[in-house]
């Protein structure tokens, strides 16, 4: 069975796992903690495709009509059980 890699779809922005050093620089630059970052669930298809685990920080780079490119950061967390 062939699996679809969602990261190859033209509508899905680039997702990359950040190194610990890059995360430290990000948090220092913006004077925040990881708790201040927006969250993304560990079972999100793009998170699964890039191999991220809970606790990783993902850098997402989107094309933007106004800015050319927009970068956002998300902390990978486990989805709460219902």
Swiss-Prot record:
Give the CC-aspect GO terms: cytoplasm; DNA-directed RNA polymerase complex
Query: Per its UniProt record, what InterPro entries does this chain match?
Result: Arch_Rpo5/euc_Rpb5, RNA_pol_subH/Rpb5_C, RPB5-like_sf
Catalytic reactions on record: RNA(n) + a ribonucleoside 5'-triphosphate = RNA(n+1) + diphosphate
Q: Does the keyword Lyase apply?
A: no
Q: Which domain of life is it from?
A: Archaea
Q: Name one GO molecular function term.
A: DNA binding
The record's EC number reads 2.7.7.6
Keyword Cell membrane applies: no
Q: Which keywords belong to this entry?
A: Cytoplasm, DNA-directed RNA polymerase, Nucleotidyltransferase, Transcription, Transferase
| GO terms (BP aspect) | transcription by RNA polymerase II; transcription elongation by RNA polymerase I; tRNA transcription by RNA polymerase III
Q: What class of enzyme is it?
A: transferase
- Write out the annotated subcellular location: Cytoplasm
**Which function does this protein serve?**
DNA-dependent RNA polymerase (RNAP) catalyzes the transcription of DNA into RNA using the four ribonucleoside triphosphates as substrates.
Q: How does it assemble?
A: Part of the RNA polymerase complex.
The record's similarity note reads: Belongs to the archaeal Rpo5/eukaryotic RPB5 RNA polymerase subunit family.
Q: Which HAMAP family match?
A: RNApol_Rpo5_RPB5
Name the chain's protein.
DNA-directed RNA polymerase subunit Rpo5
